[in-house]
Amino acid sequence: MLARAARGTGALLLRGSVQASGRIPRRASSGLPRNTVILFVPQQEAWVVERMGRFHRILEPGLNVLIPVLDRIRYVQSLKEIVINVPEQSAVTLDNVTLQIDGVLYLRIMDPYKASYGVEDPEYAVTQLAQTTMRSELGKLSLDKVFRERESLNANIVDAINQAADCWGIRCLRYEIKDIHVPPRVKESMQMQVEAERRKRATVLESEGTRESAINVAEGKKQAQILASEAEKAEQINQAAGEASAVLAKAKAKAEAIRILAGALTQHNGDAAASLTVAEQYVSAFSKLAKDSNTVLLPSNPSDVTSMVAQAMGVYGALTKAPVPGAQNSSEARRDVQTTDTSIEELGRVKLS
């Protein structure tokens, strides 16, 4: 009777403490199955059996047989993944900003024996451990890093929980931060900082665009000048090559004409033909001067055409300054030279008409 009264009093105290803390253990809500000798354990559950108050064994899923009176099912542990909402709590960052943060915890019981005898309420213990670990990890980071390094923060919390909860037979699979609430003033300052950062980026992008545009324009002008100079260079080279070709062609033609003329002069009466040609050109030059300009070069006797022809032939002889090839004798060459000297002396001065 005293034992029953003590157990009843303990149950009432436990229920009162549970109601005061706002949590309900899973084992208390579902109750424990009775020993009916033949038991069927559901899949993904582990029943902890005590014999005469001491741990006896863990019932596996399926058919199991127990001894009446001696054996008692003391704990029922679920081996499924358990989802626990971590209540919202306050935490202070490295730069002394107070945050309100909550999360979701995913865990699984790996050892039913440790989960039954290692801790009174494993779920509640893990929840409290997650809260303390989260406060500790947030104290190592500044406010900006809390938002940037959210994944690494979750991983650090999981590692810390697994190290502490190993003796409880529980493994934390993952932890996710749900919401992070900052004070209104801090939120306003963060918004201003974001706007300033955006304006800064816009200004930088605009300046970079202007810079690239100026570079492109300068590069275009440079390329245009280079292409223009190369085109001018090519044009000058082509023009010079054309002029050189023309000069060479004229020189070749003139040389060929001189060779032909020299060959003609060596023939019979070639000197006489050359003298006649020079005389004709001499007379033609005087006629052109009279047509093109008011300046006229008058011979000593303009009415005597014969004297003009003689003067022209004298000029021809002076230019040759040598006996004409094919002449009959040297006396004729001397006579031509004398005639040239006389003709040169008879040339008149330039007079204005």
From Swiss-Prot:
Keywords linked to the UniProt accession: Acetylation, Cell membrane, Coiled coil, Cytoplasm, Cytoskeleton, Lipid-binding, Lipoprotein, Membrane, Mitochondrion, Mitochondrion inner membrane, Phosphoprotein, Transit peptide
GO MF terms held by the record: cardiolipin binding; GTPase binding; T cell receptor binding
Gene Ontology cellular component list: actin cytoskeleton; immunological synapse; membrane raft; mitochondrial inner membrane; mitochondrial intermembrane space; mitochondrion; plasma membrane
List of residues that carry Phosphotyrosine: 124
Compartment(s) of residence: Cell membrane; Mitochondrion; Mitochondrion inner membrane; Mitochondrion intermembrane space
CDD domains: SPFH_paraslipin
SMART domains: PHB (SM00244)
SUPFAM superfamilies named in the record: Band 7/SPFH domain (SSF117892)
Residues making up the signal peptide according to the UniProt record: none
Modification N6-succinyllysine, positions: 145
Segments of this protein annotated with the region Disordered: 324-353
Protein's GO biological process: CD4-positive, alpha-beta T cell activation; intracellular calcium ion homeostasis; lipid localization; mitochondrial protein processing; mitochondrion organization; positive regulation of interleukin-2 production; protein complex oligomerization; proton motive force-driven mitochondrial ATP synthesis
Residues annotated with N6-acetyllysine modification: 145, 233
Transit peptide per record: 1-28
Protein topology in the membrane: Peripheral membrane protein; Lipid-anchor
Phosphoserine PTM sites in chain numbering: 17, 330
Coiled coil: 215-252
Family matches, as InterPro entries: Band7/mec-2_domain, Band_7, Band_7/SPFH_dom_sf, STML2-like_C, Stomatin_HflK_fam
Function comment: Mitochondrial protein that probably regulates the biogenesis and the activity of mitochondria. Stimulates cardiolipin biosynthesis, binds cardiolipin-enriched membranes where it recruits and stabilizes some proteins including prohibitin and may therefore act in the organization of functional microdomains in mitochondrial membranes. Through regulation of the mitochondrial function may play a role into several biological processes including cell migration, cell proliferation, T-cell activation, calcium homeostasis and cellular response to stress.
Family recorded in the similarity comment: Belongs to the band 7/mec-2 family.
Quaternary structure and partners: Forms homooligomers. Interacts with MFN2; may form heterooligomers. Interacts with PHB1 and PHB2; recruits them to cardiolipin-enriched mitochondrial membranes and stabilizes them. Interacts with CACNA2D2.
Stated name of the protein: Stomatin-like protein 2, mitochondrial
Species per Swiss-Prot/TrEMBL record: Rattus norvegicus (Rat)
Gene assigned in the entry: Stoml2
